[in-house]
Design a protein with these regions (language model features):
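Bacterial Sec-dependent N-terminal signal peptides
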Residues: 1-30, 34, 436-437
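Periplasmic alpha-helical coiled-coil/stalk elements that build and connect Gram-negative outer-membrane
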Residues: 3, 138-252, 361, 365
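Acidic, low-complexity, intrinsically disordered peripheral segments
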Residues: 6, 66, 224, 413-437
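Bacterial Sec-pathway N-terminal export signals of envelope proteins
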Residues: 19-66, 70, 76, 224, ...
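Sec/SRP-type N-terminal targeting helices
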Residues: 41-45, 58-59, 109-136, 161, ...
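Outer-membrane beta-barrel architecture
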Residues: 55, 104, 271-274, 315-317
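Small/polar, glycine/serine/threonine/aspartate-rich low-complexity segments that form flexible
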Residues: 68-104, 232-241, 286-318
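A short glycine-centered flexible hinge/capping loop motif at secondary-structure junctions
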Residues: 178-182, 390-394, 431
Length: 437
């Protein structure tokens, strides 16, 4: 948390002081994203919601106490007729005003369904925690990949700038020699064209850097107008390519998707038991302490008008018949559990395929890097030789252009190999559930 405050303070100071750029490390970017991104905040709040829901379920175990009061004004009293020796007499029955009030209490003693639902509530909280963990891992993966993408864009910009600088330098040399008549006009025009051809790649690479930085800032929840940059280069992370990965040692034990399926399966299994427990008798106790008062004058001040009464009892409820509702609910719960198990099997198969694909991509990227790295060394040497040959009049601009193209392709391939390895590795770590931060 202290590091997060320092990072945010650095960003604010950079904005207020008008600094050209504020540079972020990968660790700082992850800290900002995990604290500022709305997706993470929503996931954390969902945990609190489930915890409150769990508390609400547990409250069903405690006595329920209510206070009530009722006042009634009789508009037309009931009439009772009686026969006395052949004569019928009618009598008005009741009082003009009546009042009832007091306390009632009830508490479950034996309720198997309620007890089972408490376990479901606890599992629901665990599921919310696991979903929050999944959201954090998703964010770590997205931010890390976005960070690597910025580094790749900057590396590509560096390559194209070197190509442009080399073209400008060669053009200067050709121009000097053209002015003294030692090279043809064709060579001079060709060198000018090489400079002009190199410029669009630089502009496009610069635009790619800006766009990738915007994407990173969006993930971090930052103002898109804030001027930031990232620290380091792709080569700083290439040491990860030396790590050995064995498919037989990889498993899905910590995979967040599989953990969510496990929790959901437990919840559905509990739900099935709850539907079966609907046929189990329940026992509850209840009690009340009430007052009642009757009067025709609307006054209840006389203590004699108030009559208290109370009771306590035990209620036994035995389910006997409710149509086919309980049987249908049980069958529905069984089907839901079966469907989830089939989905789990399918997702597990897909995750294992993705795990193998990521591992193969990493291994291929290592081979591509080794090949491209060796090619860069040779291509640099070839370019230097072609320039020297042209300077002494034994080479041509075509040789320089060809060697420059070979060097450019080799450097881009090397950078792409590192980038592909890193993105495949972060995807594999996500599948394995190793992106804890």
């Amino acid at each position: 948390m202290k590091r997060l405050f320092l990072t945010m303070g650095l960003l604010m100071f950079g904005a207020l002081a008008g600094l050209a750029q504020t540079k972020l490390t990968l660790e700082q970017a992850l800290e900002i994203a995990l604290s500022e991104n709305p997706t993470i905040k929503i996931a954390d709040q969902e945990i609190e919601i489930k915890r409150y829901a769990k508390q609400g379920t547990y409250s069903s175990l405690y006595p329920k106490i209510d206070a009530s009061a009722t006042y009634q004004r009789v508009i037309e009293k009931q009439t009772m007729s009686m026969d006395f020796g052949g004569q019928t007499q009618t009598i008005k029955v009741g009082s003009d005003n009546s009042f009832n009030g007091g306390l009632t209490a009830a508490m479950p003693v034996v309720n198997a369904q309620l007890w089972a639902s408490l376990k479901v509530s606890a599992l629901d909280v665990e599921l919310a925690v696991e979903k929050a963990r999944s959201s954090r891992q998703d964010m770590v993966e997205q931010v890390t990949k976005a960070y690597y993408t910025v580094l790749l864009a900057k590396e590509s910009l560096g390559v194209y700038k070197r190509v442009y600088d080399n073209a400008v330098e060669n053009n200067k040399n050709v121009k000097k020699r053209y002015e003294v008549g030692s090279v043809s006009e064709f060579d001079y025009i060709s060198s000018n064209v090489s400079v002009q051809n190199a410029e669009p790649n630089v502009f496009e690479a610069e635009n790619s850097v800006v766009l990738t930085l915007w994407q990173l800032k969006a993930l971090l929840g930052m103002d898109l107008q804030m001027d930031i940059d990232v620290e380091g280069s792709l080569s700083d992370f290439k040491s990860a390519m030396d790590e050995a990965y064995n498919l037989s040692q990889l498993d899905l034990t910590d995979n967040t998707t599989m953990k969510q399926f496990d929790l959901q399966e437990k919840m559905l299994d509990k739900a099935l038991k709850i539907t079966k427990l609907a046929n189990v008798p329940t026992v509850s106790i209840n009690a009340a302490y009430l007052y009642t008062a009757l009067g025709n004058d609307g006054k209840f001040g006389d203590r004699k008008a108030w009559n208290p009464y109370s009771y306590a009892g035990v209620q036994l409820n035995i389910p006997i018949f409710a149509g086919n509702a309980k049987r249908a609910a049980t069958r529905q719960a069984r089907l839901n559990l079966s469907n989830l198990q089939l989905q789990r099997e399918n997702i597990e198969r897909q995750l294992r395929v993705a795990m193998i694909q990521s591992l193969n991509s990493m291994q291929t990227s290592v081979k591509q890097f080794n090949s491209a790295d060796a090619t860069v060394t040779q291509a640099k040497r070839g370019y230097d030789i072609s320039v020297k040959r042209y300077e002494v009049g034994r080479g041509t601009l075509v040789e320089i252009d060809n060697s420059q193209l070979a060097l450019t392709q080799a450097e881009l391939s090397r950078n792409s190999a590192i980038y592909n390895f890193l993105t495949s590795k972060i995807a594999l770590d996500k599948i394995l559930g190793n992106l804890e931060y």
